[in-house]
Amino acid sequence: MKAIVVIDHAAGSAGLTLTDRREPSAAINDVIVQIHASGFVPTELEWSSTWTDRAGRNRTPSIPGHELAGVVTALGYGTTGLSVGQRVFGLADWHRDGTLAEYVAIEARNLAPLPGDVDFTVGASLPISGLTAWQGLFQHGRVQAGHSVLAHGAAGAVGTMVTQLAREAGAYVIGTGRAADREKALDFGAQEFLDLDNDALEDVGGVDLVFDVIGGDVQKRSAALIRGGGTLVSVVGPVEARPADGRAVDFVVEADRAQMGEIVQRVRDGRLRTNLGTTASLDDAVAALNSTERRKGKTIIIVRP
């Protein structure tokens, strides 16, 4: 099968290579999925799991990419809840070969049914951004109606999901980003927008929840804005700053079939829109993933047109 692999950690995205790999086989509780579309997060080339297995051993050449939508072609022993020929989408294990390939072996629990009226491209755009927003807001952030949410990166793939889900929950959303992000952030539902290059973050005043996708100085300044009992939620590693009278949580997103079902149903209902950016074929993926242009939305690789 065709696959994108990485070997040299230091090379970054420049080290991505299109090659031929043996098709995977299904282990116990695994499913083989013929991939139609794959999502890719540029920062995953910085994650240790891209390069090593759970025991810390080098596993290169490895296949990156962790989001997928496709069709089940084989079931491993003990697999339940899915069937051959079924349309699915999901989130691949961090420490196994990923989804920038024609086929992937993936645990069945990491997949959810993809309804026939949802395009594979849309399905592949949902797992990381949708689950990150869902888990950050509801499991870790405990967002409630009437809360104020400061959503950093509000025009990005995660930020637009955070904004929409927070608004649906009855929260007031203040989005941040660069000046060029204002229109998109407001279009996806932010009620206010702050230009981090030109506006004073402190002018936001107190908020109940900060959803941080940036870290560093922005995280530290944001922590100071959190009201008593509020929460700082970070997806960029260990929290460096904590609110004076509140909680700070950092987490790594996990696959959850029920949550993916909730997310895709909202897409079907029109309550949730995806933020699609660049799309490219698997043959053109290396060039697309090495583009120097600023990414505008989720990058999706069309594996099977």
Q: Locations of the language-model features?
A:
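C-terminal hydrophobic helical "lid"/dimerization subdomain
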Residues: 1, 260-305
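Glycine-rich beta-strand-centered segment in the early N-terminal region that forms part
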Residues: 22-40, 51-95
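NAD(P)H dinucleotide-binding glycine-rich loop of Rossmann-like/cofactor-binding domains
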Residues: 90-153
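Mid-domain Rossmann-like dinucleotide-binding core that forms the NAD(H)/NADP(H) cofactor-binding site
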Residues: 126-195
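Glycine-rich cofactor phosphate-binding loops and adjacent beta1-alpha1 units
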Residues: 174, 184-249
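Rossmann-fold dehydrogenase core element
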Residues: 228-278
